[in-house]
Amino acid sequence: FYTDSTKFSLKKAMNGEDKAGYQMLLDGIDAIAVELKAMQEAGVPVLWRPLHEASGGWFWWGASGPEPYIELYKLMYHRLTDYHGVNNLIWVWNGQDAAWYPGDEYVDIIGEDIYPGEKVYTSQAARFLKALSYTDTRKIIALTENGCIPDPELLKRDNIMWAWWCTWEGEFVLKS
Protein backbone atom coordinates (compact mmCIF):
# COMPACT_ATOMS: atom_id res chain seq x y z
CA PHE A 1 0.00 0.00 0.00
CA TYR A 2 3.00 2.32 0.17
CA THR A 3 3.37 4.45 -2.95
CA ASP A 4 6.98 3.43 -3.54
CA SER A 5 6.01 -0.27 -3.43
CA THR A 6 3.44 -0.22 -6.24
CA LYS A 7 2.99 0.95 -9.80
CA PHE A 8 -0.78 1.32 -9.35
CA SER A 9 -2.11 4.73 -10.44
CA LEU A 10 -5.37 5.74 -8.82
CA LYS A 11 -5.69 8.55 -11.34
CA LYS A 12 -5.58 6.09 -14.25
CA ALA A 13 -8.01 3.72 -12.55
CA MET A 14 -10.50 6.50 -11.83
CA ASN A 15 -10.29 8.20 -15.24
CA GLY A 16 -10.82 4.96 -17.19
CA GLU A 17 -7.28 4.45 -18.50
CA ASP A 18 -6.84 1.40 -16.25
CA LYS A 19 -10.08 -0.57 -16.42
CA ALA A 20 -8.56 -3.57 -14.64
CA GLY A 21 -7.37 -1.30 -11.85
CA TYR A 22 -10.84 0.18 -11.47
CA GLN A 23 -12.37 -3.30 -11.32
CA MET A 24 -9.79 -4.25 -8.70
CA LEU A 25 -10.98 -1.30 -6.59
CA LEU A 26 -14.60 -2.43 -6.91
CA ASP A 27 -13.65 -6.02 -6.07
CA GLY A 28 -11.81 -4.85 -2.96
CA ILE A 29 -14.74 -2.73 -1.81
CA ASP A 30 -17.13 -5.61 -2.49
CA ALA A 31 -14.96 -8.00 -0.48
CA ILE A 32 -14.88 -5.75 2.57
CA ALA A 33 -18.63 -5.15 2.23
CA VAL A 34 -19.20 -8.82 3.05
CA GLU A 35 -17.35 -8.43 6.35
CA LEU A 36 -19.02 -5.12 7.17
CA LYS A 37 -22.45 -6.63 6.49
CA ALA A 38 -21.67 -9.45 8.93
CA MET A 39 -20.94 -6.85 11.59
CA GLN A 40 -24.10 -4.99 10.64
CA GLU A 41 -26.17 -8.16 11.04
CA ALA A 42 -24.59 -8.65 14.48
CA GLY A 43 -25.58 -5.10 15.46
CA VAL A 44 -22.00 -3.81 15.58
CA PRO A 45 -21.38 -0.18 14.58
CA VAL A 46 -18.02 0.41 12.91
CA LEU A 47 -15.80 3.47 13.10
CA TRP A 48 -14.72 3.31 9.45
CA ARG A 49 -11.55 5.25 8.61
CA PRO A 50 -10.61 4.31 5.06
CA LEU A 51 -7.89 5.89 2.96
CA HIS A 52 -6.19 7.69 5.81
CA GLU A 53 -3.38 10.26 5.60
CA ALA A 54 -4.05 10.77 1.90
CA SER A 55 -2.48 14.20 1.60
CA GLY A 56 0.88 12.80 2.69
CA GLY A 57 1.29 10.92 -0.59
CA TRP A 58 3.01 7.92 0.97
CA PHE A 59 0.02 5.62 0.32
CA TRP A 60 -1.18 4.77 -3.20
CA TRP A 61 -4.58 6.39 -2.59
CA GLY A 62 -2.93 9.78 -2.09
CA ALA A 63 -0.17 9.61 -4.69
CA SER A 64 -2.28 11.00 -7.57
CA GLY A 65 -3.56 14.08 -5.76
CA PRO A 66 -6.85 15.13 -4.21
CA GLU A 67 -9.23 14.73 -7.17
CA PRO A 68 -8.80 10.97 -7.74
CA TYR A 69 -8.72 10.43 -3.98
CA ILE A 70 -12.04 12.23 -3.49
CA GLU A 71 -13.53 10.24 -6.39
CA LEU A 72 -12.41 6.99 -4.76
CA TYR A 73 -13.70 8.03 -1.34
CA LYS A 74 -17.11 8.84 -2.80
CA LEU A 75 -17.09 5.64 -4.87
CA MET A 76 -16.41 3.62 -1.72
CA TYR A 77 -19.12 5.49 0.18
CA HIS A 78 -21.78 4.91 -2.49
CA ARG A 79 -20.70 1.35 -3.22
CA LEU A 80 -20.92 0.38 0.44
CA THR A 81 -24.02 2.34 1.43
CA ASP A 82 -26.13 2.39 -1.73
CA TYR A 83 -25.06 -0.75 -3.61
CA HIS A 84 -24.44 -3.06 -0.64
CA GLY A 85 -26.79 -1.42 1.88
CA VAL A 86 -24.15 -1.18 4.59
CA ASN A 87 -25.59 1.17 7.23
CA ASN A 88 -23.51 0.51 10.34
CA LEU A 89 -20.56 2.69 9.40
CA ILE A 90 -19.52 5.88 11.15
CA TRP A 91 -17.37 7.54 8.50
CA VAL A 92 -14.12 8.91 9.93
CA TRP A 93 -12.29 11.00 7.34
CA ASN A 94 -8.57 11.49 7.73
CA GLY A 95 -7.21 13.30 4.68
CA GLN A 96 -5.48 15.97 6.78
CA ASP A 97 -5.95 18.83 4.31
CA ALA A 98 -9.04 20.78 3.24
CA ALA A 99 -8.30 20.18 -0.46
CA TRP A 100 -8.85 16.46 0.17
CA TYR A 101 -12.18 16.81 2.01
CA PRO A 102 -14.86 14.77 0.18
CA GLY A 103 -17.82 16.77 1.53
CA ASP A 104 -19.95 16.86 4.64
CA GLU A 105 -22.40 14.24 3.40
CA TYR A 106 -19.55 11.68 3.28
CA VAL A 107 -18.00 12.43 6.68
CA ASP A 108 -19.30 11.90 10.21
CA ILE A 109 -16.06 12.52 12.10
CA ILE A 110 -12.89 14.37 11.09
CA GLY A 111 -9.65 12.78 12.24
CA GLU A 112 -6.11 14.08 12.49
CA ASP A 113 -2.94 11.98 12.82
CA ILE A 114 -0.24 13.79 14.78
CA TYR A 115 3.25 12.66 15.73
CA PRO A 116 4.74 15.83 17.24
CA GLY A 117 7.98 14.33 18.49
CA GLU A 118 9.28 12.66 21.59
CA LYS A 119 7.75 13.84 24.86
CA VAL A 120 5.59 16.56 23.29
CA TYR A 121 2.36 16.53 25.29
CA THR A 122 0.68 19.72 24.04
CA SER A 123 -3.03 19.91 23.22
CA GLN A 124 -2.28 20.21 19.49
CA ALA A 125 -4.68 23.16 19.41
CA ALA A 126 -3.55 24.40 15.99
CA ARG A 127 -4.30 21.05 14.34
CA PHE A 128 -7.63 20.75 16.15
CA LEU A 129 -8.67 24.20 14.94
CA LYS A 130 -7.42 23.41 11.44
CA ALA A 131 -9.61 20.28 11.40
CA LEU A 132 -12.60 22.37 12.47
CA SER A 133 -11.99 24.64 9.48
CA TYR A 134 -12.49 21.84 6.93
CA THR A 135 -16.27 22.33 7.13
CA ASP A 136 -18.82 24.98 8.01
CA THR A 137 -20.95 22.37 9.78
CA ARG A 138 -20.42 20.87 13.20
CA LYS A 139 -18.34 17.71 13.13
CA ILE A 140 -16.75 15.62 15.83
CA ILE A 141 -12.95 15.94 15.77
CA ALA A 142 -10.74 13.01 16.81
CA LEU A 143 -7.03 12.45 17.20
CA THR A 144 -7.11 9.27 15.12
CA GLU A 145 -3.40 8.50 15.47
CA ASN A 146 -0.92 10.07 17.81
CA GLY A 147 2.45 9.64 19.38
CA CYS A 148 2.44 11.06 22.88
CA ILE A 149 -0.91 11.39 24.61
CA PRO A 150 -1.79 15.05 25.09
CA ASP A 151 -1.67 16.30 28.67
CA PRO A 152 -5.28 16.50 29.98
CA GLU A 153 -4.52 19.73 31.83
CA LEU A 154 -3.29 21.34 28.61
CA LEU A 155 -6.37 20.08 26.75
CA LYS A 156 -8.57 21.65 29.41
CA ARG A 157 -6.58 24.89 29.48
CA ASP A 158 -6.74 25.27 25.70
CA ASN A 159 -10.38 24.09 25.49
CA ILE A 160 -9.37 21.44 22.95
CA MET A 161 -11.70 18.48 23.17
CA TRP A 162 -10.55 15.67 20.92
CA ALA A 163 -13.35 13.07 20.89
CA TRP A 164 -10.71 10.37 21.39
CA TRP A 165 -7.09 9.65 20.69
CA CYS A 166 -5.43 6.49 19.47
CA THR A 167 -1.82 6.11 20.46
CA TRP A 168 -0.39 4.19 17.57
CA GLU A 169 2.35 1.87 18.84
CA GLY A 170 5.87 1.44 20.04
CA GLU A 171 7.60 3.73 22.48
CA PHE A 172 4.49 5.87 22.94
CA VAL A 173 2.68 2.87 24.40
CA LEU A 174 5.50 0.95 26.04
CA LYS A 175 7.61 3.63 27.77
CA SER A 176 6.51 5.87 30.61
List each model region and its residues:
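Aromatic-lined carbohydrate-recognition surfaces of secreted/lumenal glycan-active proteins
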Residues: 49-51, 73-99, 138-149
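Substrate-binding surface in catalytic domains of secreted glycosidases
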Residues: 112-133, 138-139
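Alpha-helical scaffolding within the catalytic cores
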Residues: 31-35, 93-101, 122-131, 147-155
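Loop/turn elements at helix/coil->beta-strand transitions in domains of secreted/extracellular proteins
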Residues: 41-47, 84-90, 105-108, 136-141, ...
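Acidic (Asp/Glu)-rich catalytic clusters
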Residues: 2-6, 36-43, 101-105, 133, ...
